[in-house]
Amino acid sequence: MDTIGLFSVEAEHLFVEWVKKCIKKGDLTLFETLFNADPWIVNRCNKNKITVFMLICIYGRLDFLRFLFKQESYPGEIVNHYRRDKDGNSAWHYLAEKNNHLLLEEVLDYFGKNGIRVCFPNFNGVTPIMKAAMRGRTLSVLSLLKYGANPNRKDYLKGFTTWDWAVFTGHADLVKTLNKGYQKPLFMHFPLYKLDVFHRRFKKKPKIIITGCEDNVYEKLPEQNSNFLCVKKLNKYGK
């Protein structure tokens, strides 16, 4: 039984890798043929537990998605959009970090008809909106907020919120956007003691340096020497 099980896992992995090439090339006709033969192909996965549906989201194939949506009588009938890979990431995590918020909006509009969990975390507690914040995807963050994502939820390892990740990864535009409607001023959320924790535990410095002073917020310039604190000054609201 173990040998048969290993063979089936290997065979499924090879099959999904072959379908991956089909998706990468954008061969919708071949994919339609495969889907008609086995509709559950979209939930098959490779060794990393990445499903065919995740691959469609990763490569941003909107035509493939629209084809799948037309085959279902109701959202989620066939496609399992909450299925996780080996790191606990779902298709929502991959959609959120892509630089294509229109693709995310399309999927949100479709699955949102019956209600969706947009704060679905991976094994580290990172939600899709945090993934979008790490990449600086402002429009994706706003789309997820519109569908009920919680920007104040914290991950399991670092205890970061969406806003904290935007600060830590240096995406000032996203920080400004979040400050306008969803957060308090910068100095009230990212005090100096957090910076000390970064240095001790992770040996990494945030790309946006924030002082404890209410009127001073500093953004580190990436083109400067990292050994010197060369900054440009912003006001306390990040404008």
UniProtKB/Swiss-Prot annotation:
Compartments annotated for it: namely: Host nucleus; Host cytoplasm
Q: Where is this motif: PxIxITxC motif?
A: 206-213
Motif Nuclear localization signal extends across 81-87, 203-214
State where it is primarily located.
host cell
Chain span(s) of sequence motif FLCV motif: 228-231
Quaternary form? Interacts with host PPIA. Interacts with host PPP3CA/Calcineurin. Interacts with host RELA/p65; interaction of the 32 kDa form with host RELA results in the formation of a stable complex with NF-kappa-B. Interacts with host PPP3R1. Interacts with host EP300; this interaction inhibits the association of host EP300 with host RELA, JUN and NFATC2.
Which protein are we looking at?
IkB-like protein
| Native organism | African swine fever virus (isolate Tick/Malawi/Lil 20-1/1983) (ASFV)
